[in-house]
Amino acid sequence: MYSCGLVLEGGGNRAIYTSGVLDAFMDQGITFPYVIGVSAGSCNAVSYIGKCRGRQHDISIQYSGDKRFMSLENMIKNGEFLNGEWLFGELSYDLSPLDQETYDRANTTLCVVVTNALTGKAEYMYPKDFHKRGCPILRASCALPGATKGVVLGKDRYFDGGVTDSIPLAHAYEDGCQKAVVVLTQDRNYQKQPMGHARLIRRIFRKYPLMTRAILNRYKIYNRQLEAVWDAQGRGDAFVIAPDHPLHCPTLERNTDKLEQIYQTGYRNAMEQMDALKAFLALSLIHISEPTRQ
Protein backbone atom coordinates (compact mmCIF):
# COMPACT_ATOMS: atom_id res chain seq x y z
CA MET A 1 0.00 0.00 0.00
CA TYR A 2 1.34 3.42 -0.99
CA SER A 3 -0.02 6.64 0.49
CA CYS A 4 0.49 8.48 -2.80
CA GLY A 5 1.95 7.58 -6.19
CA LEU A 6 3.21 9.57 -9.15
CA VAL A 7 1.78 8.96 -12.64
CA LEU A 8 3.73 10.22 -15.66
CA GLU A 9 2.27 10.42 -19.17
CA GLY A 10 4.60 10.10 -22.16
CA GLY A 11 4.48 12.14 -25.34
CA GLY A 12 7.92 11.84 -26.91
CA ASN A 13 9.83 15.11 -26.78
CA ARG A 14 6.70 16.84 -25.47
CA ALA A 15 7.54 15.08 -22.19
CA ILE A 16 10.19 17.73 -21.60
CA TYR A 17 7.21 19.46 -19.95
CA THR A 18 7.29 16.68 -17.36
CA SER A 19 11.06 17.16 -17.01
CA GLY A 20 10.38 20.73 -15.90
CA VAL A 21 7.73 19.60 -13.43
CA LEU A 22 9.99 16.94 -11.92
CA ASP A 23 12.96 19.29 -11.64
CA ALA A 24 10.67 21.58 -9.63
CA PHE A 25 9.74 18.60 -7.45
CA MET A 26 13.42 17.85 -6.86
CA ASP A 27 14.12 21.48 -6.01
CA GLN A 28 11.33 21.32 -3.42
CA GLY A 29 12.40 17.99 -1.93
CA ILE A 30 9.31 16.06 -3.09
CA THR A 31 9.65 12.30 -3.51
CA PHE A 32 7.20 9.42 -3.91
CA PRO A 33 7.30 5.77 -2.83
CA TYR A 34 5.76 4.66 -6.15
CA VAL A 35 6.15 6.00 -9.69
CA ILE A 36 4.53 4.68 -12.87
CA GLY A 37 5.68 5.97 -16.25
CA VAL A 38 4.72 5.49 -19.87
CA SER A 39 7.12 5.87 -22.80
CA ALA A 40 9.10 9.10 -22.31
CA GLY A 41 7.41 9.33 -18.92
CA SER A 42 9.32 6.24 -17.83
CA CYS A 43 12.61 7.91 -18.78
CA ASN A 44 11.61 10.95 -16.77
CA ALA A 45 10.75 8.64 -13.88
CA VAL A 46 14.20 7.03 -13.81
CA SER A 47 16.03 10.38 -13.78
CA TYR A 48 13.66 11.69 -11.11
CA ILE A 49 14.07 8.70 -8.81
CA GLY A 50 17.84 8.92 -9.29
CA LYS A 51 17.74 12.65 -8.44
CA CYS A 52 19.46 13.49 -11.72
CA ARG A 53 18.18 17.05 -11.92
CA GLY A 54 18.34 18.43 -15.45
CA ARG A 55 19.28 15.09 -17.05
CA GLN A 56 16.15 14.70 -19.18
CA HIS A 57 16.20 18.39 -20.08
CA ASP A 58 19.77 18.13 -21.28
CA ILE A 59 19.13 14.94 -23.25
CA SER A 60 16.18 16.54 -25.06
CA ILE A 61 17.92 19.84 -25.77
CA GLN A 62 21.34 18.47 -26.69
CA TYR A 63 20.41 15.35 -28.63
CA SER A 64 16.97 15.77 -30.22
CA GLY A 65 18.62 16.98 -33.42
CA ASP A 66 21.34 14.33 -33.35
CA LYS A 67 21.11 11.98 -36.32
CA ARG A 68 22.09 9.11 -34.07
CA PHE A 69 18.84 9.71 -32.15
CA MET A 70 16.35 9.97 -35.02
CA SER A 71 16.95 10.27 -38.75
CA LEU A 72 16.26 8.78 -42.14
CA GLU A 73 19.84 7.51 -42.04
CA ASN A 74 18.85 5.30 -39.10
CA MET A 75 15.88 4.05 -41.10
CA ILE A 76 18.09 3.12 -44.03
CA LYS A 77 20.77 1.54 -41.85
CA ASN A 78 18.72 -0.20 -39.16
CA GLY A 79 15.13 -0.06 -40.36
CA GLU A 80 14.21 2.25 -37.47
CA PHE A 81 13.78 6.02 -37.53
CA LEU A 82 14.35 6.16 -33.76
CA ASN A 83 17.61 4.53 -32.75
CA GLY A 84 16.70 2.97 -29.42
CA GLU A 85 19.95 1.02 -29.30
CA TRP A 86 21.94 4.27 -29.26
CA LEU A 87 19.47 6.13 -27.03
CA PHE A 88 19.49 3.48 -24.31
CA GLY A 89 23.10 2.49 -24.89
CA GLU A 90 25.74 5.11 -25.60
CA LEU A 91 23.57 8.10 -24.68
CA SER A 92 22.13 6.74 -21.43
CA TYR A 93 25.32 5.06 -20.20
CA ASP A 94 28.24 7.04 -21.60
CA LEU A 95 27.09 10.53 -22.56
CA SER A 96 24.47 11.10 -19.85
CA PRO A 97 24.68 8.28 -17.29
CA LEU A 98 22.17 7.65 -14.52
CA ASP A 99 23.33 7.91 -10.91
CA GLN A 100 22.66 4.24 -10.13
CA GLU A 101 23.70 4.44 -6.46
CA THR A 102 21.31 7.30 -5.74
CA TYR A 103 18.58 5.49 -7.65
CA ASP A 104 19.07 2.35 -5.55
CA ARG A 105 19.02 4.30 -2.28
CA ALA A 106 15.67 5.85 -3.16
CA ASN A 107 13.87 2.55 -2.53
CA THR A 108 11.08 3.66 -4.85
CA THR A 109 8.88 1.20 -6.74
CA LEU A 110 8.99 1.93 -10.48
CA CYS A 111 6.35 0.54 -12.81
CA VAL A 112 6.83 0.83 -16.59
CA VAL A 113 3.99 0.37 -19.08
CA VAL A 114 4.59 -1.54 -22.32
CA THR A 115 2.27 -2.85 -25.05
CA ASN A 116 2.34 -6.51 -26.07
CA ALA A 117 2.11 -6.58 -29.87
CA LEU A 118 0.58 -10.06 -29.95
CA THR A 119 -2.23 -9.41 -27.46
CA GLY A 120 -2.65 -5.69 -28.09
CA LYS A 121 -2.82 -5.15 -24.33
CA ALA A 122 -0.85 -3.18 -21.78
CA GLU A 123 1.58 -4.99 -19.51
CA TYR A 124 3.26 -3.60 -16.42
CA MET A 125 6.89 -4.28 -15.60
CA TYR A 126 8.97 -3.42 -12.55
CA PRO A 127 12.65 -2.97 -13.51
CA LYS A 128 15.12 -2.74 -10.64
CA ASP A 129 18.58 -2.96 -12.15
CA PHE A 130 19.67 -0.37 -14.68
CA HIS A 131 23.26 -1.59 -14.76
CA LYS A 132 22.32 -3.71 -17.78
CA ARG A 133 23.27 -1.66 -20.81
CA GLY A 134 20.38 -1.11 -23.17
CA CYS A 135 17.52 -0.76 -20.65
CA PRO A 136 15.30 -3.19 -22.59
CA ILE A 137 12.13 -2.47 -20.61
CA LEU A 138 12.49 1.31 -20.95
CA ARG A 139 13.38 0.88 -24.59
CA ALA A 140 10.24 -1.19 -25.13
CA SER A 141 8.06 1.41 -23.41
CA CYS A 142 9.46 4.06 -25.78
CA ALA A 143 9.31 1.93 -28.95
CA LEU A 144 7.04 4.12 -31.06
CA PRO A 145 5.06 2.02 -33.57
CA GLY A 146 6.08 2.82 -37.12
CA ALA A 147 9.29 4.52 -36.03
CA THR A 148 10.80 1.38 -34.46
CA LYS A 149 10.55 -2.39 -34.82
CA GLY A 150 9.62 -2.78 -31.19
CA VAL A 151 11.66 -4.68 -28.60
CA VAL A 152 11.64 -8.41 -27.92
CA LEU A 153 11.37 -9.27 -24.22
CA GLY A 154 11.31 -12.99 -23.61
CA LYS A 155 9.31 -14.50 -26.45
CA ASP A 156 7.09 -11.50 -27.24
CA ARG A 157 7.54 -8.21 -29.07
CA TYR A 158 6.63 -5.01 -27.25
CA PHE A 159 5.93 -1.43 -28.25
CA ASP A 160 5.22 1.95 -26.65
CA GLY A 161 3.05 1.64 -23.55
CA GLY A 162 1.13 4.73 -24.59
CA VAL A 163 -0.67 2.72 -27.27
CA THR A 164 -2.73 0.90 -24.64
CA ASP A 165 -2.43 2.83 -21.35
CA SER A 166 -1.33 6.41 -21.89
CA ILE A 167 -2.33 7.66 -18.43
CA PRO A 168 -2.06 4.66 -16.07
CA LEU A 169 -3.84 6.16 -13.07
CA ALA A 170 -6.10 3.12 -12.73
CA HIS A 171 -3.11 0.81 -12.50
CA ALA A 172 -1.51 3.02 -9.84
CA TYR A 173 -4.63 2.49 -7.76
CA GLU A 174 -4.53 -1.25 -8.51
CA ASP A 175 -0.92 -1.33 -7.28
CA GLY A 176 -2.07 0.06 -3.95
CA CYS A 177 -1.79 3.85 -4.28
CA GLN A 178 -4.42 5.54 -2.15
CA LYS A 179 -3.94 8.84 -3.95
CA ALA A 180 -1.87 10.01 -6.91
CA VAL A 181 -0.21 13.02 -8.49
CA VAL A 182 -0.66 12.92 -12.26
CA VAL A 183 1.53 14.84 -14.71
CA LEU A 184 -0.03 15.23 -18.16
CA THR A 185 1.63 16.52 -21.32
CA GLN A 186 -1.56 17.83 -22.92
CA ASP A 187 -3.68 20.73 -21.69
CA ARG A 188 -6.98 20.23 -19.87
CA ASN A 189 -9.14 20.84 -22.93
CA TYR A 190 -7.27 18.43 -25.19
CA GLN A 191 -9.17 15.60 -26.86
CA LYS A 192 -7.38 13.02 -28.98
CA GLN A 193 -8.77 12.56 -32.48
CA PRO A 194 -9.06 9.32 -34.50
CA MET A 195 -5.84 8.37 -36.25
CA GLY A 196 -5.76 8.58 -40.02
CA HIS A 197 -4.09 6.20 -42.47
CA ALA A 198 -5.91 3.16 -41.09
CA ARG A 199 -5.14 1.12 -44.19
CA LEU A 200 -1.40 1.81 -43.86
CA ILE A 201 -1.45 0.92 -40.16
CA ARG A 202 -3.19 -2.37 -40.89
CA ARG A 203 -0.56 -3.11 -43.51
CA ILE A 204 2.40 -2.30 -41.28
CA PHE A 205 1.06 -4.39 -38.40
CA ARG A 206 -0.61 -7.11 -40.44
CA LYS A 207 1.14 -9.74 -38.28
CA TYR A 208 -0.37 -8.16 -35.17
CA PRO A 209 -4.10 -7.53 -35.74
CA LEU A 210 -4.79 -6.90 -32.05
CA MET A 211 -2.01 -4.31 -31.99
CA THR A 212 -3.62 -2.68 -35.03
CA ARG A 213 -6.94 -2.53 -33.22
CA ALA A 214 -5.29 -0.97 -30.17
CA ILE A 215 -3.63 1.73 -32.28
CA LEU A 216 -6.84 2.62 -34.10
CA ASN A 217 -8.91 2.67 -30.89
CA ARG A 218 -6.34 4.55 -28.85
CA TYR A 219 -8.15 7.88 -29.06
CA LYS A 220 -11.26 6.43 -27.38
CA ILE A 221 -9.31 4.96 -24.48
CA TYR A 222 -7.19 8.10 -24.08
CA ASN A 223 -10.18 10.43 -23.88
CA ARG A 224 -11.88 8.17 -21.31
CA GLN A 225 -8.68 8.16 -19.26
CA LEU A 226 -8.51 11.95 -19.35
CA GLU A 227 -12.06 12.16 -18.07
CA ALA A 228 -11.24 9.70 -15.29
CA VAL A 229 -8.18 11.72 -14.26
CA TRP A 230 -10.11 14.95 -13.90
CA ASP A 231 -12.93 13.13 -12.09
CA ALA A 232 -10.35 11.74 -9.64
CA GLN A 233 -9.08 15.25 -8.97
CA GLY A 234 -12.64 16.39 -8.35
CA ARG A 235 -13.06 13.64 -5.73
CA GLY A 236 -9.79 14.59 -4.06
CA ASP A 237 -8.12 11.31 -5.02
CA ALA A 238 -5.66 12.88 -7.47
CA PHE A 239 -3.72 16.08 -8.00
CA VAL A 240 -3.20 16.94 -11.67
CA ILE A 241 -0.48 19.09 -13.20
CA ALA A 242 -1.02 19.82 -16.89
CA PRO A 243 0.05 22.51 -19.37
CA ASP A 244 -1.92 25.72 -18.89
CA HIS A 245 -2.13 26.14 -22.67
CA PRO A 246 -1.83 23.89 -25.75
CA LEU A 247 1.83 23.06 -26.33
CA HIS A 248 1.53 22.49 -30.10
CA CYS A 249 4.46 20.10 -29.89
CA PRO A 250 4.70 17.01 -32.11
CA THR A 251 5.98 13.78 -30.58
CA LEU A 252 9.29 14.04 -32.45
CA GLU A 253 9.81 17.81 -32.11
CA ARG A 254 13.42 18.91 -32.70
CA ASN A 255 13.16 22.69 -32.32
CA THR A 256 15.26 23.28 -29.22
CA ASP A 257 13.86 26.78 -28.61
CA LYS A 258 10.35 25.34 -28.47
CA LEU A 259 11.49 22.47 -26.27
CA GLU A 260 13.16 24.88 -23.86
CA GLN A 261 9.96 26.93 -23.64
CA ILE A 262 7.96 23.79 -22.88
CA TYR A 263 10.42 22.80 -20.15
CA GLN A 264 10.11 26.24 -18.58
CA THR A 265 6.31 25.99 -18.79
CA GLY A 266 6.42 22.70 -16.88
CA TYR A 267 8.67 24.14 -14.19
CA ARG A 268 6.51 27.26 -13.88
CA ASN A 269 3.22 25.33 -13.75
CA ALA A 270 4.60 23.11 -11.00
CA MET A 271 5.85 26.02 -8.92
CA GLU A 272 2.56 27.89 -9.35
CA GLN A 273 0.73 24.91 -7.83
CA MET A 274 3.38 24.05 -5.26
CA ASP A 275 1.52 25.26 -2.17
CA ALA A 276 -1.63 23.38 -3.17
CA LEU A 277 0.43 20.31 -4.06
CA LYS A 278 2.22 20.29 -0.71
CA ALA A 279 -1.13 20.55 1.08
CA PHE A 280 -2.39 17.55 -0.92
CA LEU A 281 0.77 15.58 -0.14
CA ALA A 282 0.56 16.45 3.55
CA LEU A 283 -2.89 14.85 3.67
CA SER A 284 -1.33 11.83 1.94
CA LEU A 285 1.44 11.68 4.59
CA ILE A 286 4.17 12.17 1.97
CA HIS A 287 7.47 13.38 3.47
CA ILE A 288 8.87 16.54 1.90
CA SER A 289 12.53 17.42 2.42
CA GLU A 290 13.89 20.94 2.71
CA PRO A 291 13.91 22.73 -0.67
CA THR A 292 17.28 22.79 -2.39
CA ARG A 293 16.31 25.88 -4.39
CA GLN A 294 13.97 28.73 -3.57
Predicted region positions:
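Short "domain-exit" segments at the C-terminal end of structured domains
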Residues: 290-294
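Patatin-like phospholipase
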Residues: 1-38, 46-285, 289
